[in-house]
Amino acid sequence: MSRIGKKPVSVPAGVTAAIEGKTLSVKGPKGTLSISLADEVSYAIEDGSISVQPINETKRARSFWGMQRTLVQNLITGVTEGYSKTLQITGVGYRANVQGKNLKLQLGYSHDVDFAIPEGITIATPDQTTVQISGIDKQKVGQVAAEIRRWRKPEPYKGKGIKYAGEYIFRKEGKKK
């Protein structure tokens, strides 16, 4: 039994959900999101909530049960509140700024890195060493943050690089004489 899957997902006021064929669409104040539905799980919209139940008791159906319920919850949270991630840049001369549809990163390379901002994602730079990524799709926000971080991961000796806000970097001791 999935403890997560048992709980129905409540649909708040101002949000509409509809099942059309094998697609669940959710529309809210921030936009519209949709996912394709799994065949192993049945979905029902009733009384302002969406319930997810496995069709049979196979291991595959039970494993999809909790995951699909969480994906539905992510859709509803995305269209009501949205998601955001914050990256911090550490290092001498390392900086970032938004220029039009591109994020320009100076990360100690011989050239600047231009990162094209994808559709549906908003990137802001409150200061030169902070990058805020926000959007309504949780997966897309996390993927963009990971792609930006990949350009210069934090190194363990001085901690230079791009890290998530609140991320702990395990520091190593340097050479000894």
Swiss-Prot record:
A GO BP annotation: cytoplasmic translation
Any GO molecular function: structural constituent of ribosome
Keywords noted in UniProt: Ribonucleoprotein, Ribosomal protein, RNA-binding, rRNA-binding
Pfam family, one: Ribosomal_L6
GO cellular component, one term: cytosolic large ribosomal subunit
HAMAP family, A to Z: Ribosomal_uL6_B
PANTHER family: 60S/50S RIBOSOMAL PROTEIN L6/L9, LARGE RIBOSOMAL SUBUNIT PROTEIN UL6M
Quaternary data: Part of the 50S ribosomal subunit.
Family (UniProt): Belongs to the universal ribosomal protein uL6 family.
Function noted in UniProt: This protein binds to the 23S rRNA, and is important in its secondary structure. It is located near the subunit interface in the base of the L7/L12 stalk, and near the tRNA binding site of the peptidyltransferase center.
Record-given protein name: Large ribosomal subunit protein uL6
Annotated source species: Rhizorhabdus wittichii (strain DSM 6014 / CCUG 31198 / JCM 15750 / NBRC 105917 / EY 4224 / RW1)
Taxonomic placement: Bacteria, Pseudomonadati, Pseudomonadota, Alphaproteobacteria, Sphingomonadales
